[in-house]
Amino acid sequence: MRPRATTICSLFFLLRVLAEPAKNSDFYLPGDYLLGGLFTLHANMKGIVHLDYLQVPMCKEYETKVIGYNLMQAMRFAVEEINNDSSLLPDVLLGYEMVDVCYVSNNVQPVLYFLAQEDDLLPIQENYSNYVSRVVAVIGPDNSDAVMTVANFLSLFLLPQITYSAISDELRDKVRFPALLRTAPSADHHIEAMVQLMLHFRWNWIIVLVSGDTYGRDNGQLLGDRLARGDICIAFQETLPTVQPNQNMTSEERQRLVTIVDKLQQSTARVVVVFSPDLTLYNFFNEVLRQNFTGAVWIASESWAIDPVLHNLTELRHMGTFLGITIQSVPIPGFSEFRVRDPQAGPPPLSRTSQRSTCNQECDSCLNGTLSFNNVLRLSGERVVYSVYSAVYAVAHALHSLLGCDHGTCTKTEVYPWQLLKEIWKVNFTLLDHQISFDPQGDMALHLEIVQWQWDLSQNPFQSVASYYPLQRQLKTIQDISWHTINNTIPVSMCSKRCQSGQKKKPVGIHICCFECIDCLPGTFLNQTEDEYECQACPSNEWSHQSEASCFKRRLAFLEWHEAPTIVVALLAALGFLSTLAILVIFWRHFQTPMVRSAGGPMCFLMLTLLLVAYMVVPVYVGPPKVSTCFCRQALFPLCFTICISCIAVRSFQIVCVFKMASRFPRAYSYWVRYQGPYVSMAFITVLKMVTVVIGMLATGLNPTTRIDPDDPKIMIVSCNPNYRNSLFFNTGLDLLLSVVGFSFAYMGKELPTNYNEAKFITLSMTFYFTSSVSLCTFMSAYNGVLVTIMDLLVTVLNLLAISLGYFGPKCYMILFYPERNTPAYFNSMIQGYTMRRD
């Protein structure tokens, strides 16, 4: 505490020297408890230089700030309204003492004046718990730099300070500024409102201009940090020359403005965000007008969003669309008339009880300036004005509670700053239908509004077009905006146009907003929630066309009954089944005839039965595969077909043995006959086939699988075997071997008696089977599409028909149409003729 006290001591002498009588009742109202007010009524725009820093600047020499006077009038109006309210602070007269701080030039002296006692003494103490200052609370000032300067002094005394427009996030630090509160939303809410506005209109390529002071740097940094998390890029950021209150603009600063506007002209960005006090912008916008930079969207920070003097530059209407972030408009009944009331025309001012006052308490041109801008101020609504108004009421309610005024009377006791501060933190009341309270950071959650500048005299110059709600952090109720564009179209400010659905971004340069759009390849899609820069592959059961944002289910392909190929194959299978059934009946009725006996006798019925079963298996190839149908395809049908071929091979071998090998190898033939050689051979072949089938099923399983059609990726082929090609080679190997054996023995018996010569029939059947199987294997080695199943089924049915009609058909023909050749005598004569020819 001692260093701060020493500082106060060193400035005490300055305080005594600068005291002078008050001249204007606008700045002072006596009362039981005084409020201090710090407002910017003047600001340096003329470049006046002060060489003597020991003298406080004379603010009246600067340009009048109409907004500042408007805010000061709001404090006067609130105090007078409270004094006339019998329910709030009854029997207590609230007074005020207000000072013009000239923006940042005159902050320290008024603070010392407020902290001093009535005798202008500010004692050096170690404990200020029981210290009573001239004012009980301070309202203001308006900018963050000035607020921090004032707060550093007031915090030592825990004297309540409520600022109405400073938004810097640094002010939320209650360790540094324990006595500071504010009735304006913090900077992060202003930034969030801007960002949501830009996102709403899809502006992702912006320019940021900041002033060189703390306000510009801090808010520019906040915006940059916020945009680092989103999809908005800053094309470039420039610092505007800041005209200090004690200097003219230099030639370098003027050249700097020219350079900045040149960059604006050359940039493709058409949204310009400006964080700067209004003082810095007059020269800047004059340069913008000089270079005729048009077509931009200007987004104003709260420091100049509703500045009537800047708005008075009517040529700005041709420069583009002006949008600003400001506090919501809350009309205050009676204030519009009060603002322009001449204090000399009203009741005579009360005489001061103290002969001492501070400097910069005069503003000869304020009322005239307010009158000239009164229409703009009236139409724009009471925005920041309400922040001052609510700040005064917050102090009044806290004082009401501290003085125990709830029962109609107040106890007028000394008020220590820390006591009042404690009560201000607790206030919670409704003022003009708005809840007034402070959060733990000392902020009041007032809504923000997006306003558009209008220059139509019949309209509000600052027309509200949207609202931002800090508690929800959401921008709502966006209304139509009058864009200064052809056909009133929304301006476009994008480094790159948005990619269409199904296009990935390819970065160009260092900005994430600058990119090329590349179509996603077929079979891939773009999931923007995961990665906008890489297309993701579709799941195995899905597919996509080029430039798709999602995948669709692949069509499952399998044989269906309504398809023409299936119908053709089904008709062939039905023909084969009926033909085989007819052959079976014919053979049954002529079982004892030599023709049936020579064809194999009982073995023929085994073959015909297996052929019927094989024909019955054909329907399981149609429809979606199941475990049961896959079993029939992979086990039942191959087994039946192999046994049929083995019967033909064994039968051809047996005929050759009878006529050619029995005489040469009688003992071997006797063993063949004695031990049922044909059936043993067939049993062996059957067991061997069963082993191969079981091995195949164990290797591949019976569960249906899917594979992508190589000709059409949109189709997923459903099959019983993922390695169908290899399985086909494995399963047909034995059958091909048997067909070759049968063909060989049939060829060896081509000279046998006509009734026993089956060479041409077996050759026809086996050659057809061999050729079709080899053709199918060749086809599958080159093609793996949806036609594989139908080709496999077609070859299967044709092979069955080759056996049914090619092997058994001629025998039935002989039985039915040449019965005279189906007699034992005829067969014996044919055998005798063969024997005689051999001899």
UniProtKB/Swiss-Prot annotation:
Its main location: membrane. Residues 1-19 form the signal peptide. CDD domains: 7tmC_TAS1R2, PBP1_taste_receptor. It is found in: Cell membrane. Residues 20-566, 624-635, 703-727, 782-784 are extracellular. The chain crosses the membrane at residues 567-587, 603-623, 636-656, 682-702, 728-748, 761-781, 785-805. Glycans are attached at N84, N127, N248, N292, N312, N368, N428, N487, N527. GO terms for molecular function: G protein-coupled receptor activity; sweet taste receptor activity. Residues 588-602, 657-681, 749-760, 806-839 are cytoplasmic. Keywords: Cell membrane, G-protein coupled receptor, Glycoprotein, Membrane, Receptor, Sensory transduction, Signal, Taste, Transducer, Transmembrane, Transmembrane helix. InterPro entries: ANF_lig-bd_rcpt (IPR001828), GPCR_3 (IPR000337), GPCR_3_9-Cys_dom (IPR011500), GPCR_3_9-Cys_sf (IPR038550), GPCR_3_C (IPR017978), GPCR_3_Ca_sens_rcpt-rel (IPR000068), GPCR_3_CS (IPR017979), Peripla_BP_I (IPR028082). It comes from the Eukaryota. It is a multi-pass membrane protein. One of its GO terms (cellular component) is plasma membrane. SUPFAM superfamilies: Periplasmic binding protein-like I. Forms heterodimers with TAS1R3. Belongs to the G-protein coupled receptor 3 family. TAS1R subfamily. Putative taste receptor. TAS1R2/TAS1R3 recognizes diverse natural and synthetic sweeteners. This is Taste receptor type 1 member 2. It comes from Papio hamadryas (Hamadryas baboon).
